């Protein structure tokens, strides 16, 4: 399953987010795959596309970062997959 993870950095914590990232990396548990990410132009939000078969791995990863950022996790499907499923229904 793919998920769009929307991170909203807590006020005044942006520099700490990047300091931790440069020091420790993404800190992903095995089985959670980073696909790509985008940063808002004001550097207050990060949009990360992640993939996993076990949603609980997202909770494990979020626990590494939730002192610095708030999270919203939205399960997503790519358009071609959804279109193919609708044709079969």
Regions found by a protein language model. Name each.
Residues 18, 66-67:
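N-terminus-centered regions that define maturation/targeting leaders and the start
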Residues 1-35, 39-45, 53-57, 77-89:
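Short S/T/G/P-rich N-terminal loop/turn motif that feeds into the first structured element of a domain
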Residues 58-65:
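Short, electropositive alpha-helical surface patch
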Residues 51-52, 64:
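Conserved catalytic core of Hanks-type protein kinase domains
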Residues 68-79:
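Conserved short beta-strand edge segments in small beta-sheet-based binding/regulatory domains
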């Amino acid at each position: 399953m793919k998920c769009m993870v929307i991170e909203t950095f807590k006020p005044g914590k942006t520099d700490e987010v990047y300091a931790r990232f440069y020091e420790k990396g993404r800190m992903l548990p095995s089985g959670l795959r980073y696909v790509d990410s985008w940063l808002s132009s004001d550097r207050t939000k990060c949009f990360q596309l992640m993939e996993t078969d076990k949603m609980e791995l997202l909770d494990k990863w979020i626990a590494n970062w939730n002192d610095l950022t708030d999270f919203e996790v939205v399960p997503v499907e790519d358009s071609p997959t959804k279109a193919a499923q609708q044709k079969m229904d």
